[in-house]
Amino acid sequence: MDMQSRIRRLFQASIETKQQAMEVLAPFIEQASQVMVNALLNEGKMLACGNGGSAGDAQHFSSELLNRFERERPSLPAIALTTDSSTITSIANDYSYNEIFSKQIRALGQPGDVLLAISTSGNSANIIQAIQAAHDREMIVVALTGRDGGGMASLLLPEDVEIRVPANVTARIQEVHLLAIHCLCDLIDSQLFGSEE
């Protein structure tokens, strides 16, 4: 197969996954945005975590809220728990890598805050512990997952929201996660500041 054909095949796979996800995920993305808006209106904040590419997604989400998405508006409170290398490495060294997010959540999380927990498999041990810590702090969890939802899905409470991408290929799940994050940012802005359309 020549390279351009391979590229077209990858684009097509991404398009098909997004089309399937659009039908399945729209109500869950809407619900998650409402949970986030409610928290923000009640002086809550967003905490976000993930590993690898999902760590990048957590930072992307928090930067869109702290700075701006597609319009000028006041900054919104969001913290990516993936950015402080001194904190992360000290927790990993002194305790366990599985606690790098949960210890931060226990210190920073407050009742009514929202945790955006991102894992393509749903089985990342440190994300599972983060969800448990968020529940201990009476936070609501929005989980971005894929495949069968993994261990994360079984931990979620009725007030939590799972946005589970209907795919098994990690790259396709990540692509939909980013689109879902952009949808969340757009819906948060439109609910808080009005629609620009």
Swiss-Prot record:
Pathway: Carbohydrate biosynthesis; D-glycero-D-manno-heptose 7-phosphate biosynthesis; D-glycero-alpha-D-manno-heptose 7-phosphate and D-glycero-beta-D-manno-heptose 7-phosphate from sedoheptulose 7-phosphate: step 1/1. The keyword Cytoplasm applies. It catalyses: 2 D-sedoheptulose 7-phosphate = D-glycero-alpha-D-manno-heptose 7-phosphate + D-glycero-beta-D-manno-heptose 7-phosphate. Keywords: Carbohydrate metabolism, Cytoplasm, Isomerase, Metal-binding, Zinc. It holds the Pfam family SIS_2. Zn(2+) binds at residues 60, 64, 174, 182. Binds 1 zinc ion per subunit. One of its GO terms (cellular component) is cytoplasm. It comes from the Bacteria. The reaction produces a racemic mixture of D-glycero-alpha-D-manno-heptose 7-phosphate and D-glycero-beta-D-manno-heptose 7-phosphate. Catalyzes the isomerization of sedoheptulose 7-phosphate in D-glycero-D-manno-heptose 7-phosphate. HAMAP family: GmhA (MF_00067). PANTHER family: DNAA INITIATOR-ASSOCIATING PROTEIN DIAA (PTHR30390:SF6), SEDOHEPTULOSE 7-PHOSPHATE ISOMERASE / DNAA INITIATOR-ASSOCIATING FACTOR FOR REPLICATION INITIATION (PTHR30390). Homotetramer. This is Phosphoheptose isomerase.
